Amino acid sequence: MLQKREKVLLLRTFQGRTLRIVREHYLRPSVPCNSPLCPQPATCRNDGKLLSAEVTHYVIPDWKVVQDYLEVLEFPELKGIIFMQTACQAVQHQRGRRQYNKLRNLLKDARHDCVLFANEFQQHCYLPREKGEAMEKWQTRSIYNSAVWYYHHCEDRMPIVMVTEDEEAIQQYGSETEGVFVISFKNYLDNFWPDLKAAHELCDSIIQSRRERESESQETHGKEYPEHLPLEVLEAGIKSGRYIQGILNVNKHRAQIEAFVRLQGASSKDSGLVSDILIHGSKARNRSIHGDVVVVELLPKSEWKGRTAALCENDSEDKASGESPSEPMPTGRVVGILQKNWRDYVVTFPSKEEVQSQGKNAQKILVTPWDYRIPKIRISTQQAEALQDFRVVVRIDSWETTSVYPNGHFVRVLGRIGDLEGEIATILVENSINVVPFSEAQMCEMPVNTAENPWKVSPKEEQERRDLRSTHLVFSIDPKGCEDVDDALSVRTLNNGNLELGVHIADVTHFVAPNSYIDVEARTRATTYYLADRRYDMLPSILSADLCSLLGGVDRYAVSVMWELDKTSYEIKKVWYGRTIIRSAYKLFYEAAQELLDGNFSIVDDIPEFKTLEEQNRQAKLEELVWAIGKLTDIARHIRAKRDRCGALELEGVEVRVQLDDKKNIHDLIPKQPLEVHETVAECMILANHWVAKKIWESFPHQALLRQHPPPHQEFFSELRECAKAKGFFIDTRSNKTLADSLDSANDPSDPLVNKLLRSMATQAMSNALYFSTGSCAEEEFHHYGLALDKYTHFTSPIRRYSDIVVHRLLMAAISKDKKVEIKENLFSNKNLEELCRHINNRNRAAQRSQKQSTELFQCMYFKDRDPETEERCVVDGIIYSIRTNGVLVFIPRFGIKGAAYLKNKDGLVISCGPEGSSEWKPGSLQRSQNKIISTTAGGQSVTFHLFDHVTVRISVQPSRCHSDMIRLEIVSNKPYMMPNTELCHQSSLLLKSELVKEVTRSVEEAQLAQEVKGKVIEEEHQEYRQTKGRSLYTLLEEIRDLALLDVSDSYAM
């Protein structure tokens, strides 16, 4: 029987008035306790996650402990934690959405032994707040009362420890109830977890940081920054148009002086601004940090500044102070922060000399973040000297108006500076990637496929699915060595003479139930993360590399889209969607499929499925397969031509493919040939994605997950147009169609790299393609600019993209004949889907950044130990693709590197080239025009560098103790190093990349072995960062089609 109570809430309006609101509050005789000791599990309805039965006690943190020590409670060693609803609501109301979401994710994580107890809805636990009672006292009293009830509910069989920071509560409740202990959190760690050193260090760091924060607030100092405006003033100002809301983006090359606010939401439509807002200097930034959602006030036009066009080396000073900036742009100052983007930051402690300069007895240390865009952070620690050579993680606690720098606390050690594992861990933390091995609870949900217990198609599925095993020739075309085959194709002639085209995708959703442990984990990861030498799978390998991989000769579940096409025009007559059973006949690799398409049948000997066939049967099978590949290619040509007529773009993408041996070791790197079968497979996938998008939108117009690609801002094309003009080309950017036609015609027969670079610039100008919920967007905004399609989604890679899993469920619900209620209930509402899309978009950006950063790490490690003065491989050909006021940007086709080459050095000397092209530094000046830059010495000698000139470049590494190492480019001659873009150069470049990986990996292994021999190996907690270990830098390119040209939908972030 429910009991009704009234709950009084005091809410503050935008105008500052306080409103008293009374709401109904219902109490229940039972709520889920989630304990295995529950005497009445049916009554409590303990259907979800249960506490471990192996713990010696349960621990209940009060509201203050949850607020201040949540990161300690995240340690997996701490088990049997019961979070009371009262404490969770305190976090939500007092610490904001970010920490509250962190707590929610902790509760959902199957790896952490913690549960939520809704004490405020349990009639015996709920205590009304007494008149005049402080909120904090009521919260503590309510949590203690709930702890006592929980102890008795479990029939006094499990001691309960309530941890609190309230000394009065410890004195009052410490010995009140036998079996319920009330102690401080510090005492709890000392008594129950004395050997958990990392937790003690983190707890001490938090306590020290809190004490200093409290002491600083009592001291009076001169203000370094103005106060932020109250929330109600900010919201009113945004509504009236006086203030502008946006996301702060700090320029990593000028982190101290230059940041931009990208307009967000209504601000972008109402302000009338077409460009970002410049925030010049740290004072105008007013304690906001890169990624914060800020509120900006525009300065008068007389105070507007321009962005600097000079190259800069990520130093704290303004290196371009003597350079002329670009034309003034809207400039403003931050007046408030709506949402902080504080996260874990990887930092480096100062060297001994720097520590001494801060004071001998100073416990407050300024640490330097790995990310240039983050300001130095002041932390308190006595371990500064011991941790000088390590990368460590810190968190920001506060940033007062009286402090130049934010205050934070030490969290944990990652690894030694320069050590491969430490640097990889740094990349993961910096991109908020926290991927640990799948838990036991998650793996228990997985199917079994062993020699003793092989997986088989179930009779029930045979009845409900369309069986294609004996009626369709199904085959896959993938890179060599690919194991996670998530798509296959088929084509056949129907009885009426028309054709049937089929795209068959692994049926991941059959094995991943909605809201199961593995589904929640996959949703959290959102994507498979591919780093340079390893990957972190979204799903366990039993699915990604086995039961959901459409391998040849085995039965597999699939979700298929099949079209009936006109036999001559290939116009689509009708389409069928559904679940199928397939048995792929051939697992082809691209080169073999292309050889068959070209009529070179000697490649048959390399196709395993043909080796065991008799000659007569072999010839018949070969003719059948060749016909299918040819027909698929012909269909794909027609589909592509139709999209081309609508303005589909072909932009610059990845151009390398790895060739692996049977043991998955790297064998060779070969040039990425523009094979037609790449386009064939890509067009079939795009077609499937397009038709599935139309289907799920028709069925769920307000809650379908689609992918939009907005038209880019025209101002982003300015550099592309200027560069093309330098070569005599005109780029029309008014639409995707005119842009595509212009790029196709911008070819220099003497230098193919020109078109390659122009397409690369067009890629840089593109907006990001994003997932969205159709209920949150007008239909005219659904359009995909790059693919020239009115509706598009991702359906074809559910093994490595959670978005595709959502789309599969939408499609299944859309075609369900009986419209089962449970199918619909598992779909996301528009609001929840939009939130999920934001999460997936964020995780996709993190995946892209981490992959790029890890590749750059290996490049630097390769060149770091080479002498650039004597090593032949360090001198290469480069092509200039952009002019700056003090240098040029250069592309190195041999290694695929882009970077800055200075024409004026730190001493103010300019580059001078002799008759043979060799360079040296002399006093002089630089004169820049639109498509060239002239270096003139004091003696009157001059050298001119034009856009698209080929120059000889020396590659070296600029080491950094606090940040990542960087590739440094230096022009050593204004003459080409060799004939530009020859096949020999291109091929040798790929071979060198192979050597890069091997040498870096070998060097790391040798260094680790040497450390072990000396007995000086320092134990580092980095195993949590390693999951699926790769064998080479480019193994990932073999395993993920998203990064290769064959998946046109993703080659330019579509």
Curated annotation (Swiss-Prot):
Chain positions with Phosphoserine modification:
S989
Q: Which InterPro entries match?
A: Dis3_CSD2, NA-bd_OB-fold, RNase_II/R, RNase_II/R_CS, RNR_Ribonuclease, Rrp44_CSD1, RRP44_S1
Catalytic activity entry? Exonucleolytic cleavage in the 3'- to 5'-direction to yield nucleoside 5'-phosphates
Where is the CSD1 domain positioned along the sequence? 236-313
Any one GO MF term held by the record is: 3'-5'-RNA exonuclease activity
Q: Which SMART domains match?
A: RNB
Tell me where it mainly resides.
Answer: cytoplasm
Under the heading Pfam families, the entry gives: OB_Dis3, RNB, Rrp44_CSD1, Rrp44_S1
Ranges of residues in domain RNB: 465-816
Keywords linked to the UniProt accession = Cytoplasm, Exonuclease, Exosome, Hydrolase, Magnesium, Nuclease, Phosphoprotein, RNA-binding
GO terms, biological process: mRNA catabolic process; RNA catabolic process; RNA processing; rRNA catabolic process
Q: Where in the cell is it found?
A: Cytoplasm
- Domain CSD2: where? 365-431
On assembly, the entry states: Component of the RNA exosome complex. The catalytically inactive RNA exosome core (Exo-9) complex is believed to associate with catalytic subunits EXOSC10, and DIS3 or DIS3L in cytoplasmic- and nuclear-specific RNA exosome complex forms.
Functional summary from the UniProt entry: Catalytic component of the RNA exosome complex which has 3'->5' exoribonuclease activity and participates in a multitude of cellular RNA processing and degradation events. In the cytoplasm, the RNA exosome complex is involved in general mRNA turnover and specifically degrades inherently unstable mRNAs containing AU-rich elements (AREs) within their 3' untranslated regions, and in RNA surveillance pathways, preventing translation of aberrant mRNAs. It seems to be involved in degradation of histone mRNA.
The protein's name in its UniProt record: DIS3-like exonuclease 1
Report the source organism: Rattus norvegicus (Rat)
Which lineage?
A: Eukaryota, Metazoa, Chordata, Craniata, Vertebrata
This protein's encoding gene: Dis3l
